[in-house]
């Protein structure tokens, strides 16, 4: 019986190249992004992380919820083998696209941290801040800085992200 070795994205495409591609995406879309391996472990430092998300992640509960949302979004993208949208625990829109090589899922490209439509109302935001043991006013101030985008913008960004994921897959496949 032949044992199959675990293939890792980082073995096929170096972290600097992944970071450069991620940063180009962030610069173009002004959205947050990050690349994780097949287990949901970040390979790159996320770029364009909003002040709102940094505030939430400063809370232990918030950080755990954010990590869970990222893993669930990446898993959904990997399961569907396509770019997917999802609403995070804080009400922001995120998206994820799988990175595959020869039908093996090696990671995902996640992005977003934006609002489509109306932001949560003040009462909901204050309640969320209290659940995370965060200062409600700081939470509201940070929430006001979150980019508000149209559905078309988020669709375009997700499609571009998926195209980038396919390019990463091609690069990795050529090195495999």
Which residues does each PLM region occupy?
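Alpha-helix initiation and N-capping motif
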Residues: 49, 70-71, 122, 136-139
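Structured interaction and signal-relay segments at domain junctions
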Residues: 2-91
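Short coil/turn segments at secondary-structure junctions
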Residues: 5-9, 145-148, 152
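Active-site gating loops and adjacent loop-to-helix segments of metal-dependent hydrolytic enzymes
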Residues: 130-136
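Signal-transducing alpha-helical linker
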Residues: 10, 17, 153-156, 160-176
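Sensory/regulatory domains in signal-transduction proteins
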Residues: 68-130, 145, 152-156, 160, ...
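Regulatory/sensor and coupling segments of signal-transduction and defense proteins
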Residues: 138-149, 166, 173-176
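Residue-level signal for secondary-structure boundary elements
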Residues: 30-33, 64-67, 151, 169, ...
């Amino acid at each position: 019986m032949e044992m199959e070795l675990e293939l890792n994205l980082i073995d096929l495409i170096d972290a600097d190249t992944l970071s450069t591609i991620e940063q180009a995406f962030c610069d173009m879309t002004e959205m947050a992004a990050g690349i994780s391996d097949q287990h949901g472990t970040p390979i790159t430092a996320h770029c364009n992380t909003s002040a709102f998300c940094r505030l939430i992640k400063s809370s232990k509960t918030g950080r755990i919820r954010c990590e869970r949302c990222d893993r669930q979004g990446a898993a959904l993208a990997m399961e569907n083998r396509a770019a997917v949208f999802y609403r995070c625990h804080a009400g922001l829109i995120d998206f994820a696209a799988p990175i595959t090589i020869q039908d093996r899922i090696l990671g995902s490209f996640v992005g977003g941290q934006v609002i489509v439509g109306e932001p949560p109302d003040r009462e909901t935001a204050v309640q969320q801040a209290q659940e995370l043991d965060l200062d409600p006013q700081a939470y509201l101030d940070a929430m006001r800085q979150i980019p508000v985008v149209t559905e078309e913008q988020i669709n375009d960004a997700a499609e571009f992200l998926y195209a980038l994921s396919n390019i990463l897959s091609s690069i990795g496949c050529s090195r495999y």
